[in-house]
């Protein structure tokens, strides 16, 4: 944070406030009093678990939505090897941007060609199901540090015991955090009213996918994440088997305008490592290496190491009647059906320029009002 502020990036105490531009502490779903994770389950489900009107079935896989022509009347599932069915006046899907379109398609709601290809009985032909996939994608720059300034090694041996005791006694230390503590939102082209890059810092050598030649150790990893991708991917069926995962075509860098800001974001992350006071802590850049400087070399690095930011959205998008690929109406009802809604990240027409957690909770809150109306 101090380095970015020295570079002219202002401190921002609330990325969800009036302005997104700036550097600040990551906003987490952590209860600051107990220093424990406070998820949607804690906030919304736990308080009503004893309600006799609520039944929660875990370890269950929904195999299909039961349809009577165009009306959804229930779901079939398998739980611990046993087949079960549940019926309701309205069915609400919340399986996420990958599984919700899969469930719709294996139940006969989706693009004509997909249903025909997998010999699925057509209930409602809806071309937009599985289209419009968007995500945030990130690329890393990694450097070793001159000392043990981060969290490397805190998950084993005496450091792990020490971290556990520190948390139990004081609710501080590595166990009280996600490990991603600071981030910044900015635009490489200077349009900071509308940031296009989110940059976040992990205080260790961190790569959560196989990248040859880089070992964990004391260091720092800065990831640059593209907030407004232009490319659109898709989710299609591998088969009609409900237990088989769908085919996810991300189309990362499938639009020519996506690679340039990603490279610009990477270059900026590298300048952070080279600026004071950060540079006093840095030993050397180890990935991709200080000799990787040309646009061509950086493009190759980004294409090789790019990974998901775990924010997939858009595959059952909400839209106007005039949009042929709109899956949901403005009340989140699946077009062409009755008694069927979608309430998850797949409803977003365009991905939000930040983490999707709060946006999905906000959409769910709005959906609750629509359902009860």
Name each region found by the language model.
Residues 65-66, 74-164, 173-174, 227, ...:
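Glycine-rich loop(s) and the adjacent beta-strand/alpha-helix scaffold that form part
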Residues 63-64, 98-100, 324, 349:
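Glycine-rich nucleotide phosphate-binding loop and flanking beta-alpha elements
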